[in-house]
Swiss-Prot record:
This protein's pathway: Phospholipid metabolism; CDP-diacylglycerol degradation; phosphatidate from CDP-diacylglycerol: step 1/1
Source domain of life: Bacteria
Stated name of the protein: CDP-diacylglycerol pyrophosphatase
Record flagged with keyword Ubl conjugation: no
């Protein structure tokens, strides 16, 4: 009986993985890279016009792009080839701190909205290798889900300065959480914090998704989840975001 149960579980996992694979590759996984390298960057360099991006910073190595999903969602992407969280380049000291740059770009949301958006309503997220649809590194700059905001507010005093399991999980998935100051976030990439501080993470970075959220006391919470097909977790940190920005209508 036990063998039958394990077999059925294995079949379910294989089918789930196959479904994820189809979902991921049924479109063009290089679409964002083509926009950055073939449109935004050449237009900026040749015509000083970032279109179709909102901003292009060749020397700093990044662009900001308005995503088509959601009225206020933007993406921060590198101006050169980095696939995603699995890239060794993210652990190089010379690589830009893309999460900090993404946080600095949150003003585009307010500009698009027409009003100031409080930092507490903003979140940053990057999905794992299996949890993404595009093979060009992109950090989602968007609103946080109201229920996630409430949970993190309630857990404020229980989140440590070390990576520890977040009490109660998030969205039904296990997350690690770590509190950092604004200065720490500005000086050190969350990718490096995860790789250097979580056992075995460095060798399996592509399995992880990361998110960053501002807390009411001015600190930031780093969130990390590792893919686990047995629990149907593709490690898509974007799940904590709400691209419709319902949190703004409740304020």
């Amino acid at each position: 009986m036990k063998k039958t149960g394990y077999f059925l579980l294995a079949v379910i996992v294989i089918v789930a993985a196959a479904g994820v694979g189809y979902w991921k590759f049924s479109g063009n996984p290089d679409a964002l890279r083509e926009i950055v390298l073939e449109q935004c960057l050449p237009d900026q360099l040749q015509h000083q016009n970032p279109a179709p991006c909102a901003e292009v910073k060749p020397r700093a190595g990044y662009v900001v792009f308005k995503d088509r999903h959601g009225p206020l969602q933007y993406l921060l992407m590198p101006t050169y080839r980095i696939n995603g969280t699995e890239s060794p380049l993210l652990l190089e000291p010379a690589t830009p701190n893309f999460f900090w740059l993404a946080w600095q770009a949150r003003g585009y949301m307010s500009k698009k909205y027409g009003h100031d958006i409080p930092d507490s309503a903003v979140s940053l997220a990057i999905n794992s290798r299996l949890g993404r649809s595009q093979d060009h590194l992109h950090i989602h700059i968007s609103c946080i889900r109201p229920d996630v905001r409430e949970q993190l507010d309630n857990d404020l005093t229980r989140i440590s300065t070390r990576w520890l399991p977040l009490p109660g999980d998030l969205m039904g998935h296990e997350y690690l959480a770590r509190r950092v100051t604004e200065s720490e976030l500005a000086q050190r990439s969350p990718f490096m914090m995860l790789a250097e501080e979580v056992p075995e993470a460095r060798d399996h970075m592509g399995r992880y998704a990361l998110a960053v959220v501002r807390q009411s006391d001015g600190s930031f919470v780093l969130l990390a989840t590792e893919r686990n097909l047995l629990t149907f977790n593709r490690a898509s940190a974007e799940e904590i975001q709400d691209h419709s920005c319902a949190i703004l209508s409740s304020r």
